[in-house]
Amino acid sequence: MDFVPRLNSVLTLVLSGLWHFGLTATNCDNCDDPLASFLSLRAFSSSSDVTGSSSPAHLNWRMGTGGWSPAYSNAQQWLQIDLGNRVEITAVATQGRYGSSDWVTSYRLMFSDTGHNWQEYKQEDNIWTFVGNMNADSVVHHKLLHSVRARFVRFVPLKWNPDGKIGMRMEVYGCSYRSDVADFDGHSSLLYRFNQKTMSTLKDMISLKFKSMQGDGVLLHGEGQRGDYITLELQNGRLALYLNLDGGQARLSSIAPSAILGSLLDDQQWHSVLLERVGKQTNFTVDTNTEHFQIKAETDALDIDYELSFGGIPIPSKPGTFLKKSFHGCIENLYYNGVNIIDLAKRRKHQIYSGNVTFSCSEPQIVPITFVNSRSSYLLLPGTPRIDGLSVSFQFRTWNEDGLLLSTELSESSGTLLLILEGGTLRLLIKKVAGHGTEIITGSGLNDGLWHFVSINARRNRVTLTLDNDAASLPPDISWLQIYSGNSYYFGGCPDNLTDSQCLNPIKAFQGCMRLIFIDNQPKDLISVQQGSLGNFSDLHIDLCSIKDRCLPNYCEHGGHCVQTWTTFYCNCSNTGYTGATCHDSIYEQSCEVYRHRGNNTSGFFFVDSDGSGPLEPLQLYCNITEDKIWMTIQHNITELTQVQGSNAEKPYSMTLNYGGSMDQLVALIDGSEYCEQEVTYHCRRSRLLNTPDGAPFTWWIGRSNEKHHYWGGSVPGIQKCGCGLEQSCLDIGHFCNCDADTDEWANDTGFLSFKDHLPVTQIIITDTNRSNSEAAWRIGPLRCYGDRHFWNAVSFSTEASYLHFPTSHVEFSIDISFFFKTTALSGVFIENLGIKDFLRLELSSPSEVTFAIDVGNGPTELLVQSPSPLNDNQWHYIQAERNLKETSLQVDNFPRIMRETTEKGHFQLQLNSQMFVGGTSSRQKGFLGCIRSLHLNGQNIDLEERGMVTSGVRPGCPGHCSSYGNNCHNGGKCVEKHNSYSCDCTKSPYEGPFCQKEISALFDSTTSITYMFQEPYPVSKNTSTSSSAIYTDTVLSKETILLSFVTAQAPTLLLYLNFSTPSFLALLLSRNGSLQILYHLSKGESHMFTVSTENLANRRVHHVKMNRDGTELSIQMDQQLFSYNFPLEAEFLTVRSLILGKVTETLGLDPRVARANSLGFIGCLSSVQYNHIAPLKAALRHASIAPATVQGSLREFSCGSMVDSDVNAVTTVYSSSDPFGKTDDHDPLTNAVLSDSAVIGGVIAVVTFITFCVIGIMTRFLYQHKQSHCTSQKKEKEYSENLDSSFRHDIDLQSTTSKCKREYFI
C-alpha cells in the first residue's frame, strides 16, 4: 500500500477541515445584521390586513396604520416576509402596532425556502413559543438558540392583548448565506474520480445537507476491490451508514447497517449529515442526533478504488441504470475530506463526471396539511355530484392506529362511502340506505409515520382500493352496488353540526398529514382553502406537516421499546428488568443485603442491579441470605480442577474466565462490597509457581485492570509469595511457595485472594509443565463478597448551618433521588441543586409532609406527600423522587405514590450548574437536623461518610438502627446495635438465623429423649442477662411460658414433661383420641387436667402450642384457638428442675396417665421449643458440648414445616407390632409389658455404651502413638473433574503424606 497518497489525504483532510470550520465560525460571529429594515412593501404579506392591502411592518414604523393588524383577530392569522434569498437568521424582534392597544403576547416562527411547506422553529425538540410584547412600543428581542437558513419567515400570533387586537412590527437579524447546491432527479449522479487508482485514508470527514422528495435513495457510495466500502442510503425516511474496513465481508445487500439515524427525512426540509472517522472510531451525526461506534475490523484504513459516487450507484456497463434506488432531491455543501465536490462539478473540473445534475434546487409546490385535533379537525372539499362513479386519491402519514380518512354521502341514494384507518389497517366501507353494505380491507402497520398513497376508483358496480400501488377490489358480482359521486367530501373528521347522513364517523378523527388530494382526477388547491375561497376546515395547519417523531431520540431507557401516537409516546419495558414511564427504575435490588432487608429470607439466585437506574445491566448471582454474613457468589465458566501439561515460556498455557457479565458490572459489585475473595488452588509436580522473589514467575494471573499479578492466594499484593511464604511454613524454606520446591511429589498452594482492586481473576497463565514428569492442576473458585458499603452509608447533621456539597448533577432528561432519613426536627432541606433558572429541592416541610419541587424552565412543579403520622419520630423513613419526560413523582415509605404528568411543551432538559447541597442549602438556612443514609442519584451511590469525615457539623455514621428495625428480629430475638447496621441476637429464642426466623426442629423416634437440667445458665452468649438466672433459684415462679410446635400421627403420646422441685410435674400430652391435654400436679398433691381441644391433633399436620401462666391464670393458644383456665388461689408452683422432650426414661413413680402417653415415646417432629428464656431443643442441637442437655436415642435435625406423610411414616414403620399410626386398640397398653420392654432396652443400651467406651480408649492410645512417630497434615476436601484420570487424582490425594510435616495457613 502506497504511504504517500495516504499521508497526503490525511493532511488535506486536516488543513481543509480547519479552514472550513474556521470560516464558518467567523461568519457566525458577525451574523447579526438587520435583514428586513430596507425591504420594500412587496416583501410583506399576510393572511389578511385591516386596510385590505399589505401594510409595512418594519420595526419602529410609525406611518400609516403603524404596523400590521389583520382583519380578524383569530388563530388563523400570520405575517410573512420575503428576504429575497436564503439567508442565515440568528435573531428576531417584535413591537406592537404604533399608537394602539394592539400587540401580540406570544407567537411562533415558521421558515421556508419557497413560501410553501413551512417548517416550525423548534427548541429542545419542541415547537417553540416566543414571548411577545406587553405594550405597543417596547421592543422584545430574541436570540435564536440555533440559527436557521431560509428565504421566507412567518410570524404566527398565538395570544394578544385581550383589550385590543393583533398588532405587530418586526425585524429579522442575520447575514447572507452562500452555498453550493446540486439537484438530483432520481436518475442521476455525480462521480468523483481519484487521481490514483486507490484512495487509502486513515481519517475521513464527510459533511453535507440534503432535502429529499422521497424516503429511499443512495446519497453516497464508494468501494474497493478488496472489499472495503462506504455507503450513505435513505431507507424509509431514515439514513443508514454502511462502513467496512475489512475485505471479504458480505456485500451491501446482505448486511445490516453500521448505524442508522434520523426519521421523517423525506419531509422536503434540509437535514445535515456529518461523518467523522479516525481509524475504527466513528461519529455519525444526522441533525442533532449523534451515534458513536467502533468498526469491527483488523485494519484502520479505508481503501476506495477509482471513485466515489453521489446520488446513486451507476452500473458502468449499463449507462443510465443504477444498482439501487437513486436519490431524488437536493444536496448542499457536499465536502469529502475537505474537497468541495459540488464546486468542482460546477466548475467542470476533470475529477467530476455528472449525469443529469443541475445546480439549483427545484422543488415541487406541494402543499401539505396537518389535522391537529382528534375531535374537531376536518377538511371539507367540494366534488362534482351525480357522476356515475367516483375517484379520490391522496397521501397521508400518521402515528395513530385509528382515524377517519374520508367520508362522503353518495348521490342518488347510493349510500355512504367511508375510508377508515383502524388498527393500522385500511378499511373501505360502502353503506347503502337499504341496509346493504360491503367493505375492502388492506394493508397493515400504516401508522408508521411514512407517506402512504391511497386511491379509490368506482365505476358502476366495480370498486378498487389502491394502497401504495397495491390494488384490492370488491367482488364483481355485487349487483346492488351502484355509486354516484356526492357533492361534499369530508377528510379527517366531521363537523359537529352535521347529520349522520351527511358525514359519518364511527371512529375518532384523523390526526396526521395529508397532501396531493385529487377528486375526480382534479388536484385541489389547498391554499385556496386557507384563503377561504374553497371548501371549509377546522383545526388544520395548512401548508405545513407538523408530524414529529417522539421516539427519536429514544427516551425509553435500558432497551425499552418506544411506541408513539400523534400526541405522546409510551415505553414498553417488557423483558428489560426495568419499569416506570421511561423504563428508568430497576425492578431488582442493588445487593443481596438489600434483598434480605426487604424481607426475603430464602437463599437462591437473584438478579442484582448494582447501579439501580444507572446504565449497567442487572447480573444474576447467588445470594446466601440465611447466614449472618450475606454472601453473594458469582460463578465463572470453569469450575472443575483443570489439568495442565506441555506448557513453557514460548508456548504458555492460558485460560480466560467468563463470569456472565461485563467487567463494569463485576467492578461495581466488588467496589460496593465490604469484603471479596477468590480461592485459588495450584497442584504441582515438578511445576514451579512463582519462582524466587527475584526471579521471573512461572505462573501468574490477570485481574480487573488487565494487569499481571505475581502473588498467590493467602499472600498480599506487591510481594511474589504464596500464603505459606507469609507464614514461613513452605516445604522448602528457600522458597515462598510449596510448588517452587520443584519436587517429584505432589504439592499444592491454596489460599484466598482478597485485595478488591485486583479482583476478579480473569485469566491464568502457566508456563512450567513441559519438563519430564512435570504436570499441574489449577482451580479458581467463584468470586464471593459480603457486606453492602452503600446501604448503611450515613451521616448525621448536628447544626442547621451544616451541609455536604457534591459536584452538580449532570442529568437532563431523567433524574431519580432516593435515601433514608430520620430526625426529630420540625423541618429541613434534604437536597438542593440550582441552575440559572432550573432547580430541584427535596425537603421536610412540616413534621408530616415531604415536598419535592423542581423547575426545568417552565415554572416550578411541586409535589407534596402527607403522612398520617409524624415523620420526625426518630425512625428511618424512605424517600424516592423522580422526574422524567413523562412524569414527576414522589413516594415516602409505603404511602401512595404522588405523580404529575410532565408537560410536553417548552423546556424539558434539567440544566443545573451549582453544587448539590445535601442536608442544607447554599444560603445556610433551613438546614436539616438528623441523619441521611443510602443516598443514590440515578442509581449511583453518593459517599456521604467520606465527605462527612472532613466537614464541620457533620459526622459519619448514625446510631440507633434498632429503633427502626428492631421489629425485624422475630421470635424473641434481641436487636443489637452496630456502627453502621444492626444484628439480631437469637440466644433466648428457639429460632436462629439473621432475623431469628429459622426454626430449629428435629425428628424423634420411640427411643429419643432429651433431658434438660436447670442449673446455672450455659455460656452460649456473652450477652446473657443476669436476670435470666432467676428460673434456677428455689423461689416460686409466678410466671411461665411454654412454646412448641409438633407433627405426629401417634396418640396417645407425651410432648413435653417438666419436673418440679418435689414430685410435682407438668405434662403436655395427646390423649388417645388425639386431643391436647395439660396435666399439672402441684406441690400439695392436687392435680389439674385441662383438655384444650377435642380435635384430633395426631393428624400429620403442624400444630402450634403457646401456654402462658401468670399466677393462677392460665391461657393456652392452640393454633388459632385461645382457651383460658384458672387455678385455685392457694395453688403453689415450684421451680423447675428438668425438662424432658420425647420419652421419659426414668419411669419409676410416673403418673399412670403420663406413663400411658409415654409408653411408646414420641414419634414425630418437634420444633421451636421454648420454656421461658430457655430453648432446650436448640441447646441440644447447637450447644451440646456446653449445655446441660442429655440426648438419648436417635435425634435427627429436620424441618417440621417441610414434613410430608412419607417422612412421618419413615420414622414409624420400624414399630409395626405396635404401630401408633394404624388402628388404635380400644384397650389401654399393658403397663407391665411396657416396663419389661423398657428394662430390656435399658440393659442393651448399657452394654453398648460400655463396649463403645472401651473401643474409644483403645483407638485413642493407638492414634497417640502413631502421631509420635509420623507427621500428619490436614487436607481439605477436594472435588475432581470426571475427565481427570484416576492416577492423577490418586497422586493429588497423596499430597498430605509428602508434606514433610509442613502446614500451610490461609488468610
Swiss-Prot record:
One Gene Ontology term, aspect cellular component: membrane
Gene Ontology molecular function terms on file: calcium ion binding
Cystine crosslinks: C31-C175, C330-C361, C513-C545, C551-C562, C556-C571, C573-C583, C931-C958, C962-C975, C969-C984, C986-C996, C1165-C1200
Positions of transmembrane segments: 1239-1259
Gene symbol of the encoding locus: Cntnap5c
Statement: the UniProt record of this protein carries the keyword Transport: no
Membrane-protein topology: Single-pass type I membrane protein
Keyword Manganese: no
Keyword terms, alphabetized: Cell adhesion, Disulfide bond, EGF-like domain, Glycoprotein, Membrane, Repeat, Signal, Transmembrane, Transmembrane helix
Residue ranges constituting the Fibrinogen C-terminal domain according to the UniProt record: 585-792
Name this protein carries in UniProt: Contactin-associated protein like 5-3
CDD domains per record: EGF_CA, FA58C, LamG
